[in-house]
């Protein structure tokens, strides 16, 4: 679950703790929603930009220090699991990242478990209007791939 190398493990635990307790603007402005694509309103809130800068600093440190392609080295570990929801947010909101950080996101999104998670999310048979409103509070819907959104409306009773 955690890296076997002591330095990588210590760094990974610290990075996971930061994900657990931080990135409030990112979480609030870009709620998790796999099946939609959202264009953020401009200008992008400064808190989100600050979170993206910190995220990239953190990811770049791990990728460079431990050689990638995952944050603490060659193998997917718990720290990467903590950042998987962020990979989906990057995809949903087209968040701007450096090439190295985007490559890390692409690596996460290509994992079979992430692909399964994404496909399962698309198949959910319901919509959540309150959550959808949160998702669109800072942006405009560009695309909706969710099965529930693609269903034709039920016929009206006579």
Model-based region annotation:
Residues 2, 27, 48, 52, ...:
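Tryptophan-centric aromatic hotspots in well-structured domains and transmembrane helices
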Residues 71-96, 100-102, 106-110, 118:
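GST superfamily/GST-like fold recognition
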Residues 1-11, 66-78, 100:
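All-alpha amphipathic helical-bundle segments outside canonical DNA-binding/catalytic cores
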Residues 42-65, 71:
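A contiguous binding-surface segment within folded domains or other stable secondary-structure elements
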Residues 121-158:
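Acidic/histidine-enriched, glycine/proline-rich intrinsically disordered or flexible terminal extensions
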Residues 39-49, 103-118:
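Short, mixed-charge aromatic SLiMs
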Residues 1-46, 60, 148-158:
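GST-like domain detector, emphasizing the conserved glutathione-binding G-site
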């Amino acid at each position: 679950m955690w890296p076997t190398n002591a330095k990588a493990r210590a760094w990974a635990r610290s990075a996971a703790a930061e994900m657990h307790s931080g990135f409030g603007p990112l979480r609030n402005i870009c709620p998790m929603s796999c099946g939609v694509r959202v264009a953020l309103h401009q200008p992008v809130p400064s808190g989100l930009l600050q979170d993206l800068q910190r995220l990239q600093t953190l990811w770049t440190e791990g990728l460079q220090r431990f050689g990638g392609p995952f944050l603490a080295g060659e193998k997917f570990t718990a720290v990467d699991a903590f950042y998987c929801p962020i990979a989906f947010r990057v995809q949903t909101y087209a968040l701007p990242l450096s090439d190295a950080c985007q490559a890390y996101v692409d690596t996460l999104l290509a994992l079979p478990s992430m692909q399964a998670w994404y496909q399962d999310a698309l198949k959910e048979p319901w919509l959540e209007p309150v959550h959808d409103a949160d998702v669109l509070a800072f942006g405009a819907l560009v695309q909706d791939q969710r099965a529930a959104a693609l269903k034709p409306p039920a016929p009206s009773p006579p």
